[in-house]
Swiss-Prot record:
Matching SUPFAM superfamilies: Cysteine proteinases
Annotated segments matching region Disordered: 1-28, 114-146, 242-270, 520-760
Subunit structure: Interacts with creA, creC and qutD.
Compositionally biased spans, kind Polar residues: 8-18, 258-270
Family to which the UniProt record says this protein belongs: Belongs to the peptidase C19 family.
Gene field: creB
A Pfam cross-reference name: UCH
UniProt superkingdom: Eukaryota
Keyword Protease assigned: yes
Enzyme Commission number: 3.4.19.12
Name used for this protein in its record: Probable ubiquitin carboxyl-terminal hydrolase creB
Keywords: Coiled coil, Hydrolase, Protease, Thiol protease, Ubl conjugation pathway
Matching PROSITE patterns: USP_1 (PS00972), USP_2 (PS00973), USP_3 (PS50235)
Basic and acidic residues composition-biased segments: 578-626, 635-651, 708-742
Amino acid sequence: MGSFLRSFRNNAGSTTPSVGAVPAKKEVPIPPMTPLEKRLLDMGSIRGDGSDKFYGMENYGNTCYCNSILQCLYYSVPFREAVINYPTRTPIESLEAALAKSLRYPNPNAHLEAEAQAEKQRAANAQRPGMPPAQPQKPEDKDSPDYKKKMALQTLPLLEAQNNATSYGMSESLFTSLKDIFESVVGSQSRIGIVRPQQFLDVLRRDHEMFRTAMHQDAHEFLNLLLNEVVANVEAEASKQPAAIEKSLPAPDHAETVDQSASSGSKTPNTTRWVHELFEGTLTSETQCLTCEKVSQRDEIFLDLSVDLEQHSSVTSCLRKFSAEEMLCERNKFHCDNCGGLQEAEKRMKIKRLPRILALHLKRFKYTEDLQRLQKLFHRVVYPYHLRLFNTTDDAEDPDRLYELYAVVVHIGGGPYHGHYVAIIKTEDRGWLLFDDELVEPVDKNYVRNFFGDKPGLACAYVLFYQETTLEAVMKEQEQENMESNLSATDTNEAALKPNGSSPSHLAHVHSASYIPSLEEHNRPNGLKRAPTAPQLSTHHEHGDPESGAFSPVTATPPVPPIPEHLSAAPIPPKSDVQGKKERAREEKERKAAEKEREKAEKLRRKEQEARAKENQRREEAELKAALEASKASKAQEDRRQSPDHGKDKLGGGLSRLKRGSKSFSQRLGKDKETRSVSSLEAPPLPIPGHPISRDGPIPEQHQQQPDPKDDPFQDSHHPNKPMMKEDEQANHKDPKHERTGHGKWRSFSLRKKSFSILS
């Protein structure tokens, strides 16, 4: 018995340290779930279209510009389906073999082992003799993005896309690298992970030298280059193998996937123009000559639309400024083919064909002359959730197309030569997500409003992605948001009403029954009914916002006494509510159609008024021109009528007077002031018959003075062939110069008055 007890005590003592003293066999704590994993808990089986995959992308130092654009393009459903299905899908066997090589699952405890190894190293260094004590390291902030990215790289599956172009009959290019990334993500069996786009970057740097350096790159420039490169690769491959491309139809094994893509609004590309059909739009440059008023048009193709920014503005105002009239004058005149020369003109830009996916580039970087470099503009520019473009031509296709915001590329930094890019993307059924390289986190819808440019910090929206939608889809989305906000408000109210964490079942039942009608009445006015022009959501909290209209526990309806069972199960009939919503939608549609007709009629009336005003202006100008011509003609006739009387004397006297006036005008100014004053005060006498009097204007001043006989070659004493005048004739000839002077001045005044009366 004693030996048995001793053995029992020994066994008990030996088992005590084995329970908690062996650290090697201690269970490793499971890392907590990330917010993204919590949001994906209720998802069903993995889909075949890749819409339920949420992968980050590894940053290789300065490749955030590439990661943000690739994420935005992947979550564009029609673009993703077009890339995957062109020219054909990769066979399942080849894709699975490639995924077996490229998909790697890291050790989930690698970060714990790395931390333990680092702790051991620090302890060993501290025990060495002569070594200074190590400074205590600051613990890492587990909420920082850098720590979360490091943890994601150590715990999530890593997917490295491989070159698989030969399996679908194409040569390696930037398009095939993009297709390999998309197909790898779609074909993987994990919903979350990290893509390593090393092969894509290698092809990009091989074909384009500007991306080989470690400099900061521009996300908008990369987007434009990528779309043009995809178009070039697809068209080049189609020209090599036209017959193979035409015969590449969907195989029976993935017809279900094609049906899913068609139901989601995307189309399988049967031609090489699928990039043009998605992103391409047409701009029309209208130039009107102000001389002949002829309008000339020139079409331009765009894959993205770049707009200038103004302080405290919106995307709508920026687009209005983009299509504003520009005056072409001075050195920037327009060469009119109709007029045959440079003329002043008015120029405006309008959209003739709208793209299905609208990429709006906000020009945040502007060149300044004083700094001699680009500078970032921190202007506040508001962008809506829903957008309608108004600056379209009269013959535009589908001018009332409605767009919804589905992605925003944000630039974080103080200038164009450094910074960081992230993407905020709206997924199909998981709301808005933040893609920050390796980090993927769910965010609230209002989080998108933080990048207008007026918030503290350096983060501003840089590229906006809008995709086409319908009014019914917008209304359905708003109803879903209202329902979710109401459910969350109900849960909050019920939690607030629970005494000590428990609630009787009958109280919860009565509370929900009495609370439903008030919620339905509260949700009756929606955001679409408030918008007069477009069903766009406001960018600020308003009364109808689900976020701002949610009930709080303070304003919750208090519990009421139990009511009969037949009353508690009587909610508002859903059919009538649905019919009412359909009627409201139909009325809204009819009202918008009527407004559109009125706007067209008003535009036509304004055009007619402008045409009439221009016609009146032209007629008035013609009448004025005719009056001027008539005045000139009458003046010429009068001159011709008066010239035969004294043409010879007038011509000779005029020339002699001009000669004498130009010779001694300054000398004769001081002579005989008395004579000039007396002659100027005398009344103009009548002209002597037979005496030549100038009628074409005032006589020069030298005729008011006695000319020097030596200087005057026309004096009687210097003409030997002319007889001498008598004394009475000389007496009568003494005043004619004054008569000529006064009469000439008077006649000149009368002629001028007459000419002015004709002009008036």
